[in-house]
From Swiss-Prot:
The keyword Ribonucleoprotein applies. One of its GO terms (molecular function) is structural constituent of ribosome. Belongs to the universal ribosomal protein uL16 family. The keyword Nucleotide-binding does not apply. InterPro entries: Ribosomal_uL16 (IPR047873), Ribosomal_uL16_bact-type (IPR000114), Ribosomal_uL16_CS (IPR020798), Ribosomal_uL16_dom (IPR016180), Ribosomal_uL16_sf (IPR036920). Pfam families: Ribosomal_L16. This is Large ribosomal subunit protein uL16c.
Length: 149
């Protein structure tokens, strides 16, 4: 599973997820992509489960690019622990996702739209976010629209 080799600080605050993704929101490597529609955290286990689902369906047909990396530690305290006495230990790693972020890309000479769409659908089931399937040529028509608040 994905995790940083070393970090400057072991523990982080939770933070806030505001706005839309300004980086990593366009297709860069493949012809097809899975784009997040809402904000949230994706754990390294969920990324790995999605990757496995896609590679099993595609077999040796094409190439898959993972465009997110879990670099935020999530700490937890032991169950039935009293309040106080510091912050818990890092238990797992998450990637912070904003709307519009490209999560996975897929491409290759043997990958058709139907194969890519089905593989991305299988990966979508493993994720806790709403996502959208994108195609490189028609990306302008399927851009993310932000709701007026």
């Amino acid at each position: 599973m994905l995790s940083p080799k070393r970090v400057k600080f072991r523990k982080q605050q939770r933070g806030r997820m505001r706005g839309i993704a300004t980086r990593g929101n366009t297709i860069a490597f493949g012809q097809f992509a899975l784009q997040a529609q809402e904000c949230g955290w994706i754990t390294s286990r969920q990324i790995e489960a999605s990757r496995r689902a896609m590679t099993r369906y595609v077999k040796r047909g094409g190439r898959i690019w993972i465009r997110v990396f879990p670099d935020k530690p999530v700490t937890m305290r032991a169950a039935e622990t009293r309040m106080g006495s510091g912050k818990g230990n890092p238990e797992f790693w998450v990637a912070v996702i904003k709307p519009g972020r490209i999560l996975f890309e897929m491409g290759g000479p043997e990958i058709t739209e139907t194969i890519a769409r089905e593989a991305m659908r299988l990966a979508q089931y493993k994720l806790p976010l709403k996502t959208k399937f994108l195609i490189l040529n028609s990306q302008e028509s399927e851009t993310l629209v932000t709701p007026e608040v």
